[in-house]
A protein has these predicted regions:
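Class I (Rossmann-like) S-adenosyl-L-methionine-dependent methyltransferase catalytic domain
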Residues: 2-80, 86-141, 159-166, 170, ...
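A short acidic, Gly/Pro-enriched loop at the edge of an enzyme's catalytic core
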Residues: 141-150
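A short SAM/SAH-binding and catalytic strip from SAM-dependent methyltransferases
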Residues: 149-162
Length: 244
C-alpha cells in the first residue's frame, strides 16, 4: 500500500508541474470527478507542445470528426442554430461544430466536473460556447423547445438502455419541432458491432453496451421522435431522429 501511494505521489507531482500553469491539478479529487484518461492526454499534449485535440488525433490515432460531421450533423445546421453536445470530451468534435454556428449557440454537457472546467477554459475565446455540468442521465436545462440539434459521439455506446430512455425523453422536451437528435450506439446486428463484441477483450467488456435497432427505434418513437436514417462509422451506428 505504501509503495502504491509513493508511485501515485510521484505521478501527481510530475503531472501537476505541467498542469498547474493551465489551471489544473491532478489530485484524488480530480480522479474522482470521472475525467477518464483526459488529464493524462492533456499532460502528454502539453509536454509535446500540442493542442490536446490535435494530440488525440495525430498521436493517439483517434478517428477524425469532420467526415462524420459532414454526413450526419452539418446538413441540419444553420449559422444561427442552437446545438447541444453530450459527452464532448476535450472538444474534438465541438471545435468543428462551433465554426458552423457563428450566430448560434453551442452547449456542451458533461457529467465530469473536471471536463466542464477544462471545456470552459478551452473555449474561453468563443462566447457562444457554454459548458454545463449534468447528472449523467438527463439534460441540465429546464427550458422547452429551444434546441435545434442534439448531438453525441462515443458516449451513448456506454450507456444502459434505461439511461438512453431518460435522455431521449429529455430530447423530446428540449428540441424544437423539426429539431434533430443524432447519437451513436453499438448495434450487434451489424457486422461492425458484432465484431466489436467479439474482439473488445475482458477489460472493455464492462464498458460498452449493445442494443438492437428495434429497441432503439422504440425508445425514440415512444418519446415522439421519428428515426429517419442510420449511418455506420466503425463500431458505432449513428441514428438520426427528427422531433415532429
Amino acid at each position: 500500500m505504501a509503495s502504491q501511494r509513493n508511485v501515485r505521489n510521484v505521478l501527481e507531482v510530475g503531472a501537476n508541474r505541467v498542469l498547474r500553469p493551465l489551471g489544473y491539478e491532478l489530485r484524488d479529487k480530480v480522479l474522482s470527478e470521472r475525467p477518464e484518461g483526459f488529464p493524462g492526454y492533456l499532460e502528454a499534449a502539453t509536454q509535446s507542445g500540442m493542442d490536446v485535440n490535435d494530440f488525440e488525433e495525430q498521436r493517439l490515432g483517434w478517428r477524425l470528426p469532420r467526415p462524420t460531421l459532414d454526413e450526419i450533423v452539418f446538413p441540419y445546421l444553420r449559422e444561427d442554430s442552437v446545438v447541444c453536445e453530450i459527452g464532448p470530451g476535450t472538444g474534438r468534435w465541438s471545435r468543428h461544430v462551433v465554426d458552423r454556428v457563428p450566430g448560434g449557440e453551442l452547449h456542451l454537457v458533461d457529467a465530469s466536473p473536471w471536463m466542464v472546467r477544462f471545456l470552459r477554459t478551452y473555449f474561453r475565446e468563443r462566447p457562444n460556447v457554454t459548458a454545463h455540468l449534468s447528472n449523467g442521465q438527463s439534460l441540465p436545462f429546464e427550458r422547452r423547445a429551444w434546441l435545434d440539434l442534439i448531438f453525441s459521439a462515443n458516449t451513448f455506446v456506454e450507456l444502459k438502455l434505461g439511461v438512453i430512455h431518460l435522455y431521449v425523453e429529455d430530447f423530446a422536451r428540449a428540441l424544437k419541432p423539426g429539431g434533430y437528435a443524432v447519437i451513436d450506439y453499438i448495434d450487434p446486428t451489424t457486422d461492425e458491432g458484432w465484431q466489436h463484441l467479439l474482439t473488445q477483450g475482458a477489460e472493455m467488456a464492462p464498458v460498452y453496451t449493445f442494443h438492437t435497432p428495434q429497441i432503439i427505434d422504440r425508445v425514440f418513437q415512444d418519446a415522439g421522435l421519428r428515426v429517419e436514417r442510420r449511418y455506420q462509422v466503425g463500431k458505432s451506428t449513428f441514428v438520426i431522429a427528427r422531433h415532429d
